[in-house]
From Swiss-Prot:
An example Gene Ontology biological process: methanogenesis
Keywords, sorted A to Z: Methanogenesis, Transferase
Enzyme class: transferase
Catalytic activity, EC: 2.8.4.1
Key word Manganese present: no
Database matches in InterPro entries: Me_CoM_Rdtase_Fd-like_fold, Me_CoM_Rdtase_gsu, Me_CoM_Rdtase_gsu_sf
Gene3D superfamilies: Methyl-coenzyme M reductase, gamma subunit
Pfam families membership: MCR_gamma
Lineage of producing organism: Archaea, Methanobacteriati, Methanobacteriota, Methanomada group, Methanobacteria
Taxonomic source organism: Methanothermobacter thermautotrophicus (strain ATCC 29096 / DSM 1053 / JCM 10044 / NBRC 100330 / Delta H) (Methanobacterium thermoautotrophicum)
Stated role: Component of the methyl-coenzyme M reductase (MCR) I that catalyzes the reductive cleavage of methyl-coenzyme M (CoM-S-CH3 or 2-(methylthio)ethanesulfonate) using coenzyme B (CoB or 7-mercaptoheptanoylthreonine phosphate) as reductant which results in the production of methane and the mixed heterodisulfide of CoB and CoM (CoM-S-S-CoB). This is the final step in methanogenesis.
Cofactors: coenzyme F430
Protein name: Methyl-coenzyme M reductase II subunit gamma
């Protein structure tokens, strides 16, 4: 019998959008073009054209003791070459951004190898070897996972995900890393992800618009699709909550079993 991953519960469009993100067989829709050079500028880890910094020799040049796990697992390219670890971090507006922190974490773990990811309420970081990071970042920025207005590339001072959008639909950014170009109708980055000014602005394209965001978002909202309208998702959450509460706090659920283990029949 072949097991088919379900990814996440739910019968609504929100749940389906989440499953698309996590499913490695689903190909993200490409919505914009960002050059490799521009992406490197926004990441801010190295200058365009600069060689990758290394933290150890290439694996082929290193002597290791025999290790069956190492022989079984193919290292990613950055690890093979000894490239250092770097990151990209996103903040996602609660106003129908395409992705959100836990969705990102699950998506990264399903789709990419060699990643370390950290989840907080308003931001999501992904760390990996810099060489591989740039390729992954390009996919995350050029596709439907990213909206220039409601998704922010923010390595520091990430606040803004829960604040109201401005008159152009942009999420608040205390460091003002990006601005709205009224002539083009595009969002342009004028600073890198930690707030250092760029020599030239980087065009991230046109915001997706409110109607499109409501179609592709992975966030349940009362003014779009409420979680309580998704019976299957609610049922699973309630089951988890009940199990953790009753079992975790030992409220008579395992009393008989515990007595047997202690020899108190």
């Amino acid at each position: 019998m072949t097991y088919k991953a379900q990814y996440t519960p739910g019968e609504t469009q929100i749940a389906e959008n989440r499953r698309k993100h996590m499913d490695p067989d689903y190909e993200f829709r490409k919505l914009r073009e960002v050059s490799d050079e521009d992406l490197v500028k926004v990441l801010g880890h190295r200058n365009p054209g600069e060689s990758y910094k290394s933290v150890h020799p290439p694996l082929d040049e290193m002597d290791f003791e025999e290790d069956i796990v190492r022989d079984m697992v193919e290292p990613i390219q950055g690890a093979k070459e000894g490239v250092r670890v770097r990151y990209i971090q996103f903040a996602d507006s609660m106003y129908n951004a395409p992705a959100q922190p836990y969705d990102r974490a699950r998506t990264y773990m399903w789709r990419y190898r060699g990643v370390d990811t950290g989840t907080l309420s308003g931001r999501q970081v992904i760390e990996m070897r810099e060489l591989d990071l740039e390729g992954v970042s390009k996919e995350l920025v050029e596709t439907e996972l990213f909206d220039p207005a409601t998704t922010g590339i923010r390595g520091a001072t990430v606040h803004g995900h829960s604040l109201r959008l401005d008159e152009n639909g942009l999420m608040f950014d205390a460091l003002q890393r990006y601005v709205f170009d009224e002539e083009k109708g595009h969002v342009v980055y004028v600073k890198d992800q930690v707030g250092r000014p760029l020599d030239e602005p980087v065009d991230m394209g046109q915001p997706l618009g409110e109607d499109e965001l409501k179609k592709i978002t992975t966030i349940y909202r009362k003014d779009n699709i409420a979680m309580r309208d998704d019976k299957e998702a609610i049922e699973v959450v309630e089951n988890i909550h009940t199990g953790r509460t009753m079992g975790g706090f030992g409220m008579d659920v395992f009393k008989d079993d515990l007595r047997k283990r202690l020899g108190d029949d």
